Amino acid sequence: KNVLLKYPLFNDSFQYLSAFRFGPQKTYNRDTSLVVNKKQISKVMGQCEYAIHFLEHYKNTNIPINDLAIKTEGEDLIDYRLLSQVELWLQKISPNIKIKIETIGEDFKLKYRFNREKNTITEDMSALNTGFGITYVLPILISILSAKEDSIILIENPEAHIHPKGQAILMELIARAVSLGVQIVIETHSDHIINGSLVALKNKIINPDHLAIFYFNRDENKHVAVSHSLEITNNGHIKRPPKGFFDQID
């Protein structure tokens, strides 16, 4: 009953990333049918349990949307391969990081290294021994950078375990993907994620048709959720925000 793949929506143009994503693990499993045939990173309730297999399998495949690619610092040419671009965007969140995936029988081990001064590099570190947010954000980067135009991605709590600057960088990637034809639906409790979308609108990375924000609160009498569609100006301001909408600092 927890397998969602039987629904037509779950195809190679769709990914669902739940708040209950896999964090750092000792090893990650393989599912060739899921990853190769269906191009999915999750099998059970959006847990992204096959994201590392996906990244390993498609690591040398160029990303579908070239304009999402960024350069390695100091290089003139862009490496469009998926692993390279995931690593480069991850470096914007966690500087100097390098990704290493080892095949162990039918499983995979995820490790990281970090560039240091004087062209030296640290020893390999297990994902278990690095910051939780590094591994937690990987499925988001993988999903967006492997997405085709007109794909749909649902992401719960993209801010989880990521510091505010990292959230802003993540929203930069999300906004760029949206502007290039990827539909991304986010559930968030972070003002940095909200503000990132508004900044993207103000800076004309996205246009007003690309952004809609809904706020949900609870009707205390009926004990049901009530949604509010927020009015957003072209300059990235929310007009007349409802009571309770990130107003704790007022």
Language-model segment annotations:
Residues I155-P158:
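Walker B catalytic motif
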Residues E187:
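Conserved D-loop beta-strand region of ABC ATPase nucleotide-binding domains
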Residues K1-V137, S143, K148, E231-D250:
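Phosphate-coordinating catalytic segments in nucleotide- and nucleic-acid-processing enzymes
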Residues L77, K92, N96, K100, ...:
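RecA-like P-loop NTPase motor core
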